[in-house]
Amino acid sequence: MISLTKKYTAAGLIAKFNNLILLGRRSLKCENLSGNWSMPCGMIEPDESPEHAARREFFEETNVRASKEVSFLTDFQMKDDEFFALFYMKIDKLIFPSNDAIDAIEHDEWGFFKIAKNSLPSPMTRETRNAILKLK
Protein backbone atom coordinates (compact mmCIF):
# COMPACT_ATOMS: atom_id res chain seq x y z
CA MET A 1 0.00 0.00 0.00
CA ILE A 2 1.25 3.48 -0.86
CA SER A 3 2.50 5.30 2.22
CA LEU A 4 0.90 8.62 3.02
CA THR A 5 3.99 9.75 4.94
CA LYS A 6 6.71 9.08 2.36
CA LYS A 7 7.79 11.61 -0.25
CA TYR A 8 7.57 9.81 -3.60
CA THR A 9 9.58 11.51 -6.35
CA ALA A 10 9.74 8.73 -8.97
CA ALA A 11 7.60 5.78 -10.02
CA GLY A 12 7.73 2.77 -12.31
CA LEU A 13 5.43 0.12 -13.75
CA ILE A 14 6.23 -3.53 -14.47
CA ALA A 15 4.23 -5.43 -17.11
CA LYS A 16 3.91 -9.10 -16.07
CA PHE A 17 2.91 -11.89 -18.47
CA ASN A 18 2.71 -15.23 -16.62
CA ASN A 19 6.23 -15.55 -15.12
CA LEU A 20 7.81 -13.02 -17.49
CA ILE A 21 8.33 -9.28 -17.10
CA LEU A 22 9.11 -6.56 -19.61
CA LEU A 23 12.39 -4.71 -19.02
CA GLY A 24 14.29 -2.16 -21.06
CA ARG A 25 17.98 -1.32 -21.09
CA ARG A 26 18.48 2.40 -20.41
CA SER A 27 20.33 4.01 -23.30
CA LEU A 28 23.55 5.95 -22.88
CA LYS A 29 21.50 9.09 -23.61
CA CYS A 30 19.82 8.76 -20.20
CA GLU A 31 21.21 10.76 -17.30
CA ASN A 32 20.13 8.17 -14.73
CA LEU A 33 21.00 4.48 -14.80
CA SER A 34 22.59 4.48 -18.28
CA GLY A 35 23.16 0.89 -19.42
CA ASN A 36 21.06 -0.58 -16.60
CA TRP A 37 18.00 -2.74 -17.15
CA SER A 38 14.80 -1.44 -15.58
CA MET A 39 11.07 -1.15 -15.94
CA PRO A 40 9.61 1.97 -17.58
CA CYS A 41 9.93 4.66 -14.92
CA GLY A 42 10.53 8.32 -14.27
CA MET A 43 9.96 11.38 -12.16
CA ILE A 44 6.61 12.26 -10.64
CA GLU A 45 5.31 15.60 -11.87
CA PRO A 46 3.92 18.18 -9.39
CA ASP A 47 0.32 17.36 -8.39
CA GLU A 48 0.59 13.87 -9.95
CA SER A 49 -0.01 10.67 -7.98
CA PRO A 50 2.68 7.96 -8.02
CA GLU A 51 0.31 5.60 -9.88
CA HIS A 52 -0.52 8.20 -12.52
CA ALA A 53 3.19 8.92 -13.00
CA ALA A 54 3.92 5.20 -13.41
CA ARG A 55 1.15 4.87 -16.01
CA ARG A 56 2.31 8.01 -17.86
CA GLU A 57 5.96 6.91 -17.93
CA PHE A 58 4.96 3.44 -19.14
CA PHE A 59 3.06 4.97 -22.05
CA GLU A 60 5.76 7.54 -22.87
CA GLU A 61 8.47 4.86 -23.00
CA THR A 62 6.54 2.02 -24.70
CA ASN A 63 3.62 3.66 -26.54
CA VAL A 64 1.38 1.07 -24.83
CA ARG A 65 -1.43 2.09 -22.45
CA ALA A 66 -1.40 0.48 -19.01
CA SER A 67 -4.30 -1.83 -18.21
CA LYS A 68 -7.10 -0.65 -15.95
CA GLU A 69 -5.86 -2.66 -12.98
CA VAL A 70 -2.48 -1.59 -11.65
CA SER A 71 -1.30 -2.78 -8.23
CA PHE A 72 1.25 -1.33 -5.84
CA LEU A 73 4.21 -3.70 -5.42
CA THR A 74 6.72 -1.96 -3.16
CA ASP A 75 8.76 1.16 -2.64
CA PHE A 76 12.38 1.88 -1.87
CA GLN A 77 14.44 4.81 -0.76
CA MET A 78 16.40 6.59 -3.46
CA LYS A 79 18.18 9.22 -1.38
CA ASP A 80 17.59 11.03 1.90
CA ASP A 81 13.82 11.44 2.14
CA GLU A 82 12.93 10.56 -1.48
CA PHE A 83 11.22 7.30 -2.42
CA PHE A 84 10.50 5.33 -5.61
CA ALA A 85 7.01 3.75 -5.93
CA LEU A 86 6.80 0.56 -7.98
CA PHE A 87 3.58 -0.80 -9.47
CA TYR A 88 2.80 -3.83 -11.64
CA MET A 89 0.07 -4.96 -13.99
CA LYS A 90 -0.79 -8.37 -15.36
CA ILE A 91 -1.08 -8.57 -19.12
CA ASP A 92 -2.75 -11.34 -21.14
CA LYS A 93 -0.41 -11.20 -24.12
CA LEU A 94 3.12 -10.10 -24.88
CA ILE A 95 3.44 -6.42 -25.73
CA PHE A 96 6.13 -4.79 -27.79
CA PRO A 97 7.32 -1.23 -27.17
CA SER A 98 7.16 1.03 -30.19
CA ASN A 99 9.95 3.12 -31.65
CA ASP A 100 7.24 5.79 -32.03
CA ALA A 101 6.94 6.21 -28.25
CA ILE A 102 7.43 9.75 -26.94
CA ASP A 103 10.52 8.71 -24.96
CA ALA A 104 11.65 5.81 -27.16
CA ILE A 105 15.26 7.05 -27.02
CA GLU A 106 15.42 6.24 -23.30
CA HIS A 107 15.90 2.51 -24.05
CA ASP A 108 18.08 0.81 -26.63
CA GLU A 109 16.81 -2.74 -26.06
CA TRP A 110 13.69 -4.43 -24.68
CA GLY A 111 13.01 -7.97 -23.59
CA PHE A 112 10.81 -10.27 -21.54
CA PHE A 113 12.66 -12.02 -18.73
CA LYS A 114 11.74 -14.83 -16.37
CA ILE A 115 11.18 -13.76 -12.76
CA ALA A 116 14.08 -15.69 -11.27
CA LYS A 117 17.32 -14.56 -9.66
CA ASN A 118 19.53 -16.10 -12.36
CA SER A 119 17.32 -15.07 -15.30
CA LEU A 120 17.28 -11.30 -14.84
CA PRO A 121 19.64 -9.27 -17.04
CA SER A 122 22.62 -7.28 -15.77
CA PRO A 123 23.47 -4.65 -14.90
CA MET A 124 20.46 -3.80 -12.74
CA THR A 125 20.25 -1.94 -9.46
CA ARG A 126 19.95 -4.05 -6.33
CA GLU A 127 16.69 -2.27 -5.43
CA THR A 128 15.13 -3.06 -8.82
CA ARG A 129 16.25 -6.71 -8.69
CA ASN A 130 14.89 -7.20 -5.16
CA ALA A 131 11.58 -5.56 -6.07
CA ILE A 132 11.14 -7.75 -9.17
CA LEU A 133 11.78 -10.91 -7.17
CA LYS A 134 8.81 -10.00 -4.94
CA LEU A 135 6.55 -10.77 -7.93
CA LYS A 136 7.24 -14.53 -7.77
Stretches found by the model and what they are:
Residues 15-17, 25, 90-91, 114:
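Residue-level signal for short segments within beta-strands and strand-turn junctions
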Residues 42-135:
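Unchanged
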Residues 17-60:
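Conserved Nudix-box catalytic region and its N-terminal flanking loop in Nudix hydrolases
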Residues 6-8, 16, 31-32, 79-82, ...:
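A generic fold-level signal
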Residues 3-5, 29, 77, 100:
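Generic marker of residues within folded, mature protein domains
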Residues 1-22:
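Conserved N-terminal beta-strand and adjoining loop/helix that marks the start
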